[in-house]
Amino acid sequence: MTIKLHDLRPAPGSKTPRTRVGRGEGSKGKTAGRGTKGTKARKQVPTTFEGGQMPIHMRLPKLKGFRNRFRTEYEIVNVGDIARLFPEGGTVGVDELVAKGAVRKNSLVKVLGDGKLTVKVDVTAHKFSGSAREQITAAGGSVTEL
């Protein structure tokens, strides 16, 4: 015999009706599964209540300071990264760095001076650190700020 879609039935006992409590003495009446007396029998206790011990939100320290809403965030590229990504040198701009996967699209780029640069590179970015500027010019390249 083949099973047909209209013959399917849920397993016995898997679809029990919702128990309605507090509706007469016959089943779950009177105290309605809450036990006898006490706060939990009479009203709802907040989920944050810890039984009188000092609550977690008061035990933790307050956050100091503030977060500057006008801070500009830069994607960081080191001089060593430029030397690794562009071993032949040439012109390096934000678009070239995005194409190589060094920075995300539509982001501000800051070049920092970590690493060594030996090839001549003309770098265009939004910001440069002092050491990065020195290394690029020492290698014979140029620095252009957007």
UniProtKB/Swiss-Prot annotation:
Alphabetized PROSITE patterns for the sequence: RIBOSOMAL_L15
Pfam families found in the cross-reference section: Ribosomal_L27A (PF00828)
Alphabetized GO MF terms: rRNA binding; structural constituent of ribosome
Region (Disordered): 1-54
Keywords (A to Z) from UniProt: Ribonucleoprotein, Ribosomal protein, RNA-binding, rRNA-binding
GO terms (BP aspect): translation
Assembly and binders: Part of the 50S ribosomal subunit.
Its biological purpose: Binds to the 23S rRNA.
Record's protein name: Large ribosomal subunit protein uL15
Organism: Mycobacterium marinum (strain ATCC BAA-535 / M)
